[in-house]
Amino acid sequence: TTAPLVPAVAADPAAIARGKYLVAIAGCNDCHTPGYFFGKPDMARFLGGSEVGFEIPGLGVFHGPNLTPDKATGLGDWTDAEIVAALQKGQRPDGRVLAPIMPWHAFAHLTKQDVGGIVAYLRSLPAVAHKVPGPFGPAEPPTSFVMKIVPPSAK
């Protein structure tokens, strides 16, 4: 058998506090908290998923998903190892890759203790029932406010 991706980190206050700190400095709320892009983050739904999508030319529109432990709309049905794979490998439980805007490459270098702390913190949050729109393919019209990401043209 293979070793688990997640260390056996008990959901103790120190691990949760470390995870909270890392989530804050990583700016996870920027893309995953409703209202953030309108300058009025809804802290009652902290990390509950964004209603604003990012349009990436040729790829479609992606929304920051719900990171709370809600079983229907968040990470509640994900295992700890699946959360770690998303954070450090950019891979969803069904094998699809996460949206290109997710900075998993940076998180790939987190220590096992740090990623375990993030998982413990996300598990400690109140569940927020909030289904985000999309994703929408390149030819699909989005049903939400969209921020366009336009790469510089090659010269």
Predicted features and spans:
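Glycine-centered flexibility sites
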Residues: 19, 27, 60, 74-76, ...
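A structural feature that tracks compact, well-ordered secondary-structure segments
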Residues: 70-81, 85-91, 104-107, 119-124
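The canonical Cys-X-X-Cys-His
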Residues: 19, 25-35, 83, 118, ...
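Flexible coil segments in periplasmic/lumen-exposed cytochrome c-class electron-transfer proteins
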Residues: 2-8, 12-14, 33-62, 93-155
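Short, solvent-exposed loop/turn elements at domain surfaces
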Residues: 30, 38-40, 74-77
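Short, contiguous, well-ordered secondary-structure segments
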Residues: 1-5, 81-84
